[in-house]
């Protein structure tokens, strides 16, 4: 039986203890993007949200938001556990570990933000505890969480696990992000919708990073295996946001939401280097203004003016990485 080729990304080397020299400029550039876009929960103003929560939303909308936030609050903890217990020790390249270090920090901030939103909106202690324990108490959340957690154990290859967590961050969040942006179109819940902009941008970057690492692997999965993982995630997300927690509660069309999830999945497959499964167009043209892809308008139209000044100069300026400039001249 032929031996498997060595994976440079996963092979222990003393170089991992020192940041320079950079071996993967694309990974380094992703790290600098993550560094440039750091934010904190204190930057999000929730003062208007309480008024909207009490006076502008109906019971169905409140139910939807509560359960979406409950899923988000739990899922970030699962992503964190995978990063801390698996990916940080799997990957042996210092610039990739640097990215994961920032991802761990920002996932903690996402978790804090979602918990703060629930704490702000839900006054009843018993209901709030029920939502914070959604993995145990809410079946539709538990199903998504169980799918994500099964990829943390040691039985699958790194390639399979990185595809699965690209699905968690690229597909499992897509319907919920889209629904919250729908509320933004209506001018409701500015704190929730602003934090959603920040978090969806971050998750897009994390998904892009997973795709980049996958493309750098020497041994990739069969197209059939990748599509099996992606389509499984699509069905679970579709069930969650179309049936178990129907997007109709916030006035969105079920069939169009299902199509949107398929569109997101096809885009992910393309980023991984595979063909489309669904071949559908984006039914929500207004989502193109937001886009879950981390690269989209990242520096031109950053939301909330929170990109840290000068951080990208080492990549975009006259430094060591001139050949890897992130151009602002292209049309995204």
From Swiss-Prot:
A single GO molecular function term of this UniProt record: metal ion binding
Disruption phenotype: Embryo lethality when homozygous.
Cofactor(s) the record lists: Fe cation
EC number: 1.17.4.1
Residues binding Fe cation 2: 107, 169, 203, 206
Matches recorded under Gene3D superfamilies: Ribonucleotide Reductase, subunit A
Active site: 114
Sequence positions that bind Fe cation 1: 76, 107, 110
Keyword line: Cytoplasm, Deoxyribonucleotide synthesis, Iron, Metal-binding, Nucleus, Oxidoreductase
Entry keyword Nucleus: yes
Enzyme class: oxidoreductase
GO biological process, one term: DNA repair
Tissues expressed in: Expressed in roots, cauline and rosette leaves, stems and flowers.
Binding note for cofactor: Binds 2 iron ions per subunit.
InterPro entries: Ferritin-like_SF, RNR-like, RNR_small, RNR_small_AS, RNR_small_fam
Pfam families: Ribonuc_red_sm (PF00268)
Record field: catalytic activity: a 2'-deoxyribonucleoside 5'-diphosphate + [thioredoxin]-disulfide + H2O = a ribonucleoside 5'-diphosphate + [thioredoxin]-dithiol
Keyword field contains Oxidoreductase: yes
UniProt subcellular location: Cytoplasm; Nucleus
A cellular component term, taken from the record's GO annotations: nucleus
Subunit structure: Homodimer and heterodimer with RNR2A. Heterotetramer of two R1 and two R2 chains. Interacts with CSN7 (via C-terminal tail).
Other observations noted: 'TSO' means 'ugly' in Chinese.
Family from the record: Belongs to the ribonucleoside diphosphate reductase small chain family.
Name by which UniProt lists this protein: Ribonucleoside-diphosphate reductase small chain C
Gene that this polypeptide is encoded by: TSO2
């Amino acid at each position: 039986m032929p031996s498997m080729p060595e994976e440079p990304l996963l092979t222990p080397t003393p170089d991992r203890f020192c940041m320079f020299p950079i071996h993967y400029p694309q990974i380094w550039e992703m790290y600098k993007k993550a560094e440039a876009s750091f934010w904190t929960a204190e930057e999000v103003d929730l003062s208007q949200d309480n008024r909207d929560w009490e006076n502008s939303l109906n019971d169905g909308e409140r139910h939807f938001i509560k359960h979406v936030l409950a899923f988000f609050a739990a899922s970030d903890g699962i992503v964190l556990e995978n990063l801390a217990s698996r990916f940080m020790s799997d990957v042996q390249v210092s610039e990739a570990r640097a990215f994961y270090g920032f991802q761990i920090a920002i996932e903690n901030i996402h978790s804090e933000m979602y918990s703060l939103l629930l704490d702000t909106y839900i006054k009843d202690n018993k209901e709030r505890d029920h939502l914070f324990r959604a993995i145990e108490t809410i079946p539709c959340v538990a199903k998504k969480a169980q799918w994500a957690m099964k990829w943390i154990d040691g039985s699958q290859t790194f390639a399979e696990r990185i595809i699965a967590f690209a699905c968690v961050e690229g597909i499992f969040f897509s319907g919920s992000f889209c629904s919250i942006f729908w509320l933004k179109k209506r001018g409701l819940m500015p704190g929730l919708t602003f934090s959603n902009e920040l978090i969806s941008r971050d998750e897009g970057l994390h998904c892009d990073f997973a795709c980049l690492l996958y493309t750098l692997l020497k041994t990739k999965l069969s197209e059939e295996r990748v599509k099996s993982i992606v389509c499984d995630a699509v069905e679970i997300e579709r069930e969650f946001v179309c049936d178990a927690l129907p997007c109709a509660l916030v006035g969105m069309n079920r069939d169009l939401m299902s199509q949107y999830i398929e569109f997101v999945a096809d885009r992910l497959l393309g980023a991984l280097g595979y063909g489309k499964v669904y071949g559908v167009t984006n039914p929500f043209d207004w989502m193109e203004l937001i886009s879950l892809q981390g690269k989209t308008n990242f520096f031109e139209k950053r939301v909330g003016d929170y990109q840290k000044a000068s951080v990208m100069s080492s990549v975009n300026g006259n430094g060591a990485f001139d050949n890897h400039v992130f151009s602002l001249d292209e049309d995204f």
